[in-house]
Amino acid sequence: MVINKLILLILLFFCKISYVFTQKLPDGFCPSPLIYKNSTDRISDINRGYQFIGETNCVQPCPSLVYSESDWKNFFDASLYGGAISIFCSLFLLITYSPLVNNKHNRHTISIMFLFSGIFIMLASNGRVFWNNNEGYFDRICPEKGRFARQSDRYCLAMGIFYQFGCLTGMMWWTTLSVDVWMTIKKIKISNRQIFYYACIVNFLAIFLTFIPIARDQYGASNFGIGCWILGLWDQVFGFWAPLGICLTIGCIFITLIMYEIYKATGQIKKKLLLKYYKPLVLIILMFFEFFYMFIFITYIIDHRNKYNDEVAEYIVCILINSGNPNYDEICKIKRSIPPAAQFLFFLFSRLMGFEGVIFYGLTNQTKRIWLRSFWFNNRISLKFRSSFNISSSTNSSTNTFEKQTPSHLVDPIDQFDNIEISNNQNIELSQIENK
């Protein structure tokens, strides 16, 4: 008897859904938060980003119902302020390790430069960092009321390209950095030509995987994001999540190998290895967990996508059935299977990478040396200024010495450090990375 009642209730529920989603509502009427859309070309409007509710002229609001309005604002603020700080941090590192400042390149500095160039481009996808700040919270992803931005919207396309290319570049060069640290410890060297070919291949892959979705018209704003990215599930898997999974696997292997090399070293060698590599190693591990969290979170969303759709459908059925009740907004409450805190961490982690980079690569002796030996500190104007400063703060004799010979602090410290050998004729070379 109980089973029969349960079956009857289920049948009645699905009959309600079928009735609600096939009925025609009065023109111009849609219960809040649904939005009325007078559509003359339904297919075209769907392609433009409107999400119609069944056969009605009601569309889902933008941003979507998956989170409350206050949750969406919190996500946006975290992205805006965290991204604004991080983008300037990554820009500083990009300039520092670029040919504009750094005139001595090796495998390691090239990896750092491309890594933070990718992070900078990814963060630049947050249009409100560069574009009009006077617009509303979500005007870039919701260009019209109830419409999710699509590739045909120029800002949406720009956001999608920047985010996709930046993420791909960042994660592939993060993997390269983990391999490079291990190769440095093992004294494995490769030629400049090999480095050049590798950089071309990696950047070509990033460009290829970025522009394939454009040909398939796949960039747009989704129910889960605060920007534009790839919409189709299989396009996401092929264009991003599969490459990320490969990068995470390679990165995990080489993190383990690095830790093993440090573990098996003894005495002074272990101390020197720890002192030399703890900063890049900690950064690599932090970014591994951040990329890994992004991977796990999106897997969770994909796994719960149908459940989310059912929750939204149930909520919409409720408000349509109870729209005649003035208290329907209190009767109908949407269930949210995706915790807002988990989504918040997803946005936060992707916008902390530039800040972390400055901590582990910006506040180092290597960064100081790069700037001190750069053109910007060794041109006629800067040398004249520094000479004047020394005159005002030194004795006449020290001033004459400064004018007659190159100051000791302008001698390339990296060259000096590269000549230092580890005592006891040990065979571990520590000269390529300096992060004291």
From Swiss-Prot:
For this UniProt record, give its keywords in alphabetical order, as a comma-separated list: Glycoprotein, Membrane, Receptor, Signal, Transmembrane, Transmembrane helix
Q: For side Extracellular, which residue ranges?
A: 23-74, 131-156, 216-237, 303-343
Please list the residue ranges that the record places on the Cytoplasmic side of the membrane: 96-109, 178-194, 259-281, 365-436
What PANTHER family does the entry give?
Answer: FRIZZLED_SMOOTHENED-LIKE SANS CRD PROTEIN B-RELATED, G-PROTEIN-COUPLED RECEPTOR GPCR FAMILY PROTEIN
Glyco sites are at 38
Lineage of source species: Eukaryota, Amoebozoa, Evosea, Eumycetozoa, Dictyostelia
Is Transmembrane found in the keyword set? Answer: yes
Q: Name one GO cellular component term.
A: membrane
The leader peptide range reads 1-22
The Swiss-Prot or TrEMBL record describes its family as follows: Belongs to the G-protein coupled receptor Fz/Smo family.
Q: How does it sit in the membrane?
A: Multi-pass membrane protein
Q: What is its main location?
A: membrane
Q: Where in the cell is it found?
A: Membrane
Query: Where does the sequence pass through the membrane?
Result: 75-95, 110-130, 157-177, 195-215, 238-258, 282-302, 344-364
The name on file for this protein is Frizzled/smoothened-like sans CRD protein B
